[in-house]
Amino acid sequence: MISILPESNYAAVMAETVEPYLDSRRQEMDMPLSTGGTLHAEVYEQPDATRAVVILHGYTESAEKFREMTWYFLNEKFNVYAIDHRGHGKSVRKISDTSITHVDAFSDYLRDLEEFMSGVVLPRTEHLPRVLYAHSMGGAIGGMTLMNHPEYFARAALTAP
């Protein structure tokens, strides 16, 4: 059964328990993209994982927003793979002002996810069922990717797509 973080001392539990645990497990990577630049990812792997989840964030967000969800997934024996979409977080961007998000075409997001899946996720999760957890704009990216590549994921949860 999943133990939800308490509201009464949420900030303290995140700072004293969750963040140190995630920091000890997080592998950050910058994957080169075929179109230039890099896609930033946070990878959390554990030897006793029984499943894998790919997390796709929403517009103007980044993988960092889903650290609490990452904690829950890790406690449920998932390996976690979370990216910063292009123009977001630490990934390639065309505009230096980090308060502005820009992408030339929505298909860029789809291609980036395909490259992340083929270059990072699929080789590391051949033996695990994969789940997609995608929020808002990430849900749109995930939904279109599911249509094009149903073999990527056994299940999907799209929140506010």
PLM feature spans:
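Active-site glycine-rich loops that stabilize anionic/oxyanionic intermediates
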Residues: T50, G58-E61
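Conserved alpha/beta-hydrolase
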Residues: Y72-S96
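An N-terminal hydrophobic leader/cap segment in hydrolases
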Residues: M1-P32, L39-V43
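Active-site nucleophile loop of the alpha/beta-hydrolase fold
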Residues: A157-P161
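Alpha/beta-hydrolase fold nucleophile elbow
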Residues: R124-S136
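Short glycine-enriched nucleophile-adjacent loop
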Residues: G139-P150
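Serine-hydrolase catalytic-loop signature spanning alpha/beta hydrolases and amidase-signature enzymes
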Residues: T60-E68, V80
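Alpha/beta-hydrolase active-site loop
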Residues: T101-L122
